[in-house]
């Protein structure tokens, strides 16, 4: 198992409800171990830990882009 951390930047003005939906849908992807927003310092930053042997990063980013087409990913 190869675990990778990834940071996805989303629009800072997304509502709390939309951020919760993104978090849940990303977390529900096969191969994702955890996905959480940094609610205090960077509420637009979704931190994802996933198994890159199971799910490609683009698939995870595509989930976030359903809610914010301009979402971008940064490897950690």
Model-derived regions: residue spans:
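Conserved short beta-strand edge segments in small beta-sheet-based binding/regulatory domains
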Residues: 35-36, 66-76
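A generic structural motif
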Residues: 44-49
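Short amphipathic alpha-helices in soluble, non-transmembrane regions
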Residues: 21-26, 59-68
């Amino acid at each position: 198992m190869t675990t990778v951390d990834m940071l996805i930047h989303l629009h800072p003005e997304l509502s709390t409800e939309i951020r919760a939906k993104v978090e849940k849908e990303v977390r529900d992807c096969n191969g994702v171990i955890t996905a959480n927003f940094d609610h205090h310092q960077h509420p637009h930053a979704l931190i994802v830990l996933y198994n890159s042997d199971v799910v490609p990063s683009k698939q995870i980013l595509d989930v976030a882009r359903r809610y914010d087409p301009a979402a971008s990913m940064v490897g950690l």
